[in-house]
């Protein structure tokens, strides 16, 4: 072999970066003559040697004597039977653990505070609400473009090159131009023009430190292999905190980042584990589309009325993508290929859904609502990244479009999702303001309540009978917790007047169930994760009936 796997750190660092970013616990590096097994929960660094985090190392002459041990650990059968996982658990006892999601969460939380401090200090006109939105959008945009680079959809170092340009101009001005080009390319809403963003003053040092943190050697992540589901779990926790002003300064404000009151009361953010999402999706969407053709599925609508960062919608979308690909390969493959629904990847020699088909499925089938504007943007971002998953060069330079050749843009890659993913309070409609006494509510209170009219937002779907499936993990908020979780007296009165299940001590998850029953078709399928106390408590008698 031309590379010494025992001593050369480069192959080890590469495999560890990929595995760590994919949240894989173990990685195997081999050229057959040498074999090394690494614990990839240990974060790689540029200073690591080839031996760092290495659990085992063998050469060809030792394979025979260790054959049984190797077969029991890393053979196909061992992996299939779960013995590989057992080996990982054994190794876990000997070493500390680290996870890519915790690391990235800490990284973007640091960015949030850094950006918030800078913007609040140098932009006297901005308020807390718009500060939060602007910080979120900047982070989303930078992270999206960096992921696109590693997926080879964008040219590598596109973001970092803006720092070099910034030496003769303000870095933020260069980034705004880049965002405009990205908006023309992706059409996702993610890069839409924003008056507050355009007017901001941000110091070059702040932005350059964020961008440089996304590139080697400061960054050890391989963004192309980080699953969208992991990014969703990161953002779910990220959204559990808010930016608050602390003091007035000469030119702006001081800031802090604190937990939302409802998150603090609950003891933290709880992200729905991926395996639970998969199970619920299989038992609802899976049952609903079983045996159906793509044409039949195209008229179906699937909803999460409290979508958060989008875990259930991403899970639903993935299930639909897998189902369609399997269907096309099993039913008239040549026709599906001829009509552009699938294509054969020249590198892997496997069939994939075309971007156009993935766009069609996303816009036809996936719907969500959330009261938190930042959560809505994260849901869209997660769905867009899922659409772009495994695309790579097919969309990058020499492929469909190139970010800096705007005249070459034939079709924007991503669909607009404003008609599918909406921001609002799933439980409170505009009739909340019918009582004249409520007109005293200020802008901040109106933003918190965030009324939402289902009949207006999804008129065509409801006129056709409603959604085919409703799934999710709604908030559990008791009326007795209203002070800490922000449910005001007017909201409680509204619930009592408009929901049959709003009796005694209100719990919002029951109201979500009642609301969902009116949003579904008569033959629709419904599945929520809810606490089991409704089985025994007296206040849930009507709910049990």
Q: Where are the regions a protein language model picked out?
A:
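A short, conserved, highly charged catalytic patch centered on acidic carboxylates
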Residues: 1-26, 34-65, 70, 83-87, ...
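Acidic/polar, low-complexity linker and loop regions
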Residues: 1-3, 100-114, 334-352
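Short, polar/flexible loop-turn hinges at active-site or ligand-entry regions and domain interfaces
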Residues: 2-7, 25-26, 44, 91-95, ...
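Short, glycine/acidic-rich beta->alpha junctions
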Residues: 7-11, 19-20, 135, 139, ...
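SAM-dependent methyltransferase catalytic region
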Residues: 15, 158, 221, 246-544
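Conserved, well-folded catalytic cores of nucleic-acid-processing
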Residues: 25, 237, 241, 386-389
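Preference for the N-terminal adenyl/adenosyl cofactor-binding alpha/beta module
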Residues: 33, 68-321, 365-378, 424-430, ...
């Amino acid at each position: 072999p031309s590379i010494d796997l025992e001593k050369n750190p480069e192959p080890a660092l590469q495999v560890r970066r990929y595995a760590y970013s994919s949240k894989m616990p173990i990685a195997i590096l081999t050229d057959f003559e040498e074999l090394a097994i690494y614990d990839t929960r240990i974060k790689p660094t540029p200073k690591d040697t080839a031996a760092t985090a290495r659990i085992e190392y063998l050469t060809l002459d030792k394979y025979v004597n260790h054959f049984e041990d190797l077969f029991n650990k890393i053979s196909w059968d061992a992996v299939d039977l779960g013995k590989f996982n057992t080996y990982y658990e054994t190794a876990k006892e000997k070493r500390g653990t680290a996870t890519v999601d915790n690391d990235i969460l800490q990284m973007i939380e640091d960015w949030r505070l850094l950006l918030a401090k800078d913007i609040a200090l140098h932009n006297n006109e901005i308020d807390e609400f718009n500060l939060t939105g602007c910080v979120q959008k900047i982070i989303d945009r930078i992270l999206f473009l960096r992921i696109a680079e590693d997926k080879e959809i964008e040219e590598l170092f596109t973001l970092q090159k803006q720092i070099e340009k910034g030496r003769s101009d303000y870095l933020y001005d260069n980034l705004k131009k880049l965002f405009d080009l990205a908006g023309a390319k992706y059409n996702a809403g993610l890069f839409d023009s924003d008056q507050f963003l355009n007017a901001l003053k941000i110091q070059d040092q702040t932005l350059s430190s964020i961008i440089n943190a996304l590139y080697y050697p400061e960054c050890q992540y391989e963004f192309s292999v980080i699953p969208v589901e992991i990014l969703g779990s990161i953002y779910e926790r990220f959204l559990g905190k808010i930016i608050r002003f602390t003091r007035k300064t000469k030119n702006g404000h001081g800031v802090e980042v604190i937990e939302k009151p409802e998150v603090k009361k609950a003891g933290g953010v709880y992200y729905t584990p991926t395996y639970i999402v998969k199970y619920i999706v299989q038992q609802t969407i899976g049952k609903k589309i079983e045996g159906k053709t793509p044409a039949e599925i195209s008229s179906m609508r699937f909803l999460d009325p409290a979508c958060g960062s989008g875990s259930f919608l991403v899970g639903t979308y993935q299930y639909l993508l897998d189902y369609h690909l399997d269907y096309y390969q099993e039913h008239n493959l040549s026709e599906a290929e001829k009509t552009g629904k699938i294509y054969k990847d020249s590198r892997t020699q496997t069939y994939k859904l075309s971007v156009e088909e993935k766009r069609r499925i996303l816009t036809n089938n996936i719907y969500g609502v959330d009261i938190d504007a930042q959560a809505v943007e994260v849901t869209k971002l997660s769905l867009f990244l899922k659409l772009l998953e495994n695309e790579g060069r097919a969309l990058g330079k020499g492929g469909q479009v190139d970010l800096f050749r705007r005249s070459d843009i034939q079709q924007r890659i991503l669909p607009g999702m404003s008609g599918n993913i909406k921001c609002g309070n799933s439980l409170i409609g505009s009739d909340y303001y019918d009582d004249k006494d409520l007109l005293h509510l200020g802008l901040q209170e109106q933003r918190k309540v965030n009324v939402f009219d289902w009949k207006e937002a999804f008129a065509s779907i409801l006129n056709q009978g409603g959604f085919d499936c409703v799934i999710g993990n709604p908030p559990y908020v008791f009326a007795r917790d209203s002070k800490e979780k922000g449910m005001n007296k007017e909201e409680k009165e509204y619930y009592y007047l408009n929901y049959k299940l709003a009796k005694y001590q209100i719990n919002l998850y029951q109201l979500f169930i009642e609301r969902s029953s009116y949003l579904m078709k008569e033959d629709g399928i419904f599945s929520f994760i809810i606490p089991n106390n409704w089985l025994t408590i007296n206040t849930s008698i009507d709910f049990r009936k």
